[in-house]
Amino acid sequence: MKKIAVLVPCYNEELTIANVIEDFHQHLPEADIYVYDNNSSDKTAQVALEHGAIVVPEYQQGKGNVVRSMFRDIDADCYIMVDGDDTYPAEDAVKVAQLVLDGKAEMAIGDRLSSTYFTENKRPFHNLGNRMVRGLINFIFNSNVKDIMTGCRAFSRRFVKSFPVLSAGFEIETEMTVHALDKNLAIREIPISYRDRMEGSVSKLNTFSDGFKVLITIFRLFREYK
């Protein structure tokens, strides 16, 4: 049986992390669930431990730093990465992972934008930013990736162990896509459901400052890769 690891980068997700873990216990009971806690000031780590996750602290702030540690530390045949905010159903994430398990993709993408994202997401500037990033990446790389910034992906071991993580923050989503496009790695997408954050759960993404970093990252990576 192939080894599957569920990777959940977390920063202050006390309200939602239990739902995420239990959802995967139900739909993918054979998987190991790793919660990397990125200096949370709430009880994210405690709740994750209580629900059976493997909890690892990551002291360098930023999602990119968390992903770097995850990819370095964890050995598996297939890796599923989801945000800890309970916006991605585990049932759909398993379908994304199946594309990797079947050998159809090195990176599989859960495409929110072709599904419920624009009706569920209540942050209009996030919607605009997603469209802008998608258009720019596809123009530069002559590609047709539908959801560049999704927080639900699956990876092969080959992808994970060959990916040089350069970004420290949320730009990591863009970097993963650019890496796959530049190296001509097989990418597959499948539409998935997306649900908005529950009341009281706050997005850590700053639309303007993080959006600016993403744009800078796109041009930096284009220069370095090309």
Task: For every predicted segment, state its role.
Residues Y59-D73, A90-F170, D196-F212:
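Acceptor/aglycone-binding surface of glycosyltransferases and processive sugar-polymer synthases
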Residues K3-A5, D32, E175:
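Cell-envelope/extracellular polymer assembly enzymes that use nucleotide-activated donors
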Residues N38, V82-G84:
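Active-site acidic Asp-centered loop
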Residues N12-Q26:
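Short, well-formed alpha-helical segments that are part of the catalytic scaffolds
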Residues Y79:
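Short aromatic/hydrophobic "clamp" motif used to bind/position activated sugar donors
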Residues M1, I140-S143, V165-K226:
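Hydrophobic helical membrane-anchoring modules
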Residues D37-A45:
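A conserved acidic beta->alpha catalytic loop
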Residues E13-T16, S40, K63:
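Donor nucleotide-sugar binding loop of glycosyltransferases
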